Regions:
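Bacterial N-terminal signal peptides that target proteins for export
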Residues: 1-8
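SH3/SH3-like beta-barrel superfamily modules
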Residues: 72-112
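Active-site phosphate/ATP/adenylate-binding loop shared across adenylate-forming ligases
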Residues: 12
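Beta-loop motif signature
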Residues: 22, 27-83, 87
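Boundary regions of SH3-family modules and the immediately adjacent low-complexity/disordered segments
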Residues: 21-37, 43, 96-117
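Intrinsically disordered, low-complexity regions enriched for glutamine and histidine
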Residues: 2, 19-20
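N-terminal signal peptide c-region/cleavage motif recognized by signal peptidases
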Residues: 15-17
Length: 117
């Protein structure tokens, strides 16, 4: 059992690491539709912790509060961004929006899982 768990952990780390290598400064990437975008990294960190904790009621409440306060946004279409920085340990990216429109050039913090693969 212990050997199987170790193998699973190594394979998971390799999969995450291989995708994280694609997320690099200066890269242009597409963000999935309906992803949550944060104006402050602290709000993203809290969102990630609540999501990981598994308490869906608390997570949904926080997300709704952040969206309502305009500390976070949810765009319904896929959008193109430029990676400003990426922290693989935290799975957090600071991005600049490249898709033409009202928010062109704005900077955001997003979860690393928000990128299209």
């Amino acid at each position: 059992m212990r050997m199987h768990l170790s193998t699973l952990l190594v394979l998971t780390a390799l999969m995450v690491g291989s995708f994280a290598q694609q997320i690099r400064e200066g890269a242009k990437m597409e963000v999935k539709p309906d992803s949550i975008w944060f104006s402050e990294v602290g709000n993203l960190s809290t969102w990630q912790k609540l999501k990981k904790a598994g308490n869906s009621a608390e997570f949904e409440s926080y997300q709704t509060k952040e969206l309502g306060a305009r500390h976070a946004w949810q765009f319904t279409k896929p959008l193109t961004v430029k990676i400003i920085s990426f922290e693989p340990q935290k799975n957090q990216a600071k991005v600049q929006l490249l898709t033409p429109g009202r928010y062109l050039g704005s900077t955001w913090w997003i979860d690393g899982n928000a990128f299209s693969k």
